Amino acid sequence: KDSTTVCASDAPFSLFALLGGSPDAGGTWTAPGGGANNGTFVPGTSVAGAYTYTVAGTSPCANANATVTVSVVQPPNAGISGSLTVCSNGPAVNLFNSLTGSPAVGGTWQRPNGTSHPGLFDPLVDVAGTYTYTVAGTLPCASRSSTVQVTKVQAPEAGTNGSITVCNTQAPFQLFTVLGGTPSGSGTWRTPANAPFSGTFTPGTTPAGIYKYVVLGNAPCPNDTSFVTVVVNTAPNAGTNATSTVCSDQATFNLITRLGGTPNTGGTWTGPDNQPFPGGAYDPGVSQPGAYTYT
């Protein structure tokens, strides 16, 4: 009896070559189930088991038989190679899920540089490239490998939220300068009412509120958004300078009524002697003449 173990993915072979000794050619083969066989074993198709070779004897010699036992080992299945596209700031992804063809679990992964990899691709750490999955074979079957080609798309960067408080008399400025981080300059702005906006804020004209900055992402990366909150304070109004000539016997009056413009109330007065002049009530018969300052 002779025997052999083959891999189910091996090429077809002749059973006759496995017989020991110096067998006569021209015999017949019988398969394990008793059916006829042409003497060619096709791994993955032919049934494993004992194949009998028979050479007919010439009377009074009996027939001669020999047996070849074939065992078949299934090859490892590493699946069918695939591809994966991830965002550079996305979550970790199991590379195994990018393989098709029912791959066997328990294989090993290698990075593009050939070093070992756990199989969980982290876009924040791992490099793009070809990752190889290998499933070890049981002799005589060799190991098999498949690959996942990973492409990493750079995530959009809208920076971090910012806030600013300005006076309504300040010069126009760019909201972009208020953002933190390292925002890309390719984004667009929206007003608090979600209308398109140029990004140039003009205090006293542009309304205060929360402005949105959006940088578009390339698939599979989503858009990135940041916000700038703008508070606008109204500048104080002390009115415009004025002069007033009064008679010494006139009634007391409030100096604010003599200022030009539309001054805010609640300010403070300073007399000609640079001393506080509480209330701003000017008594022509008592108060000294001169320049009174309203702040």
Which residues fall in each region the model found?
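Proline- and Ser/Thr-rich low-complexity, intrinsically disordered segments
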Residues: 1-295
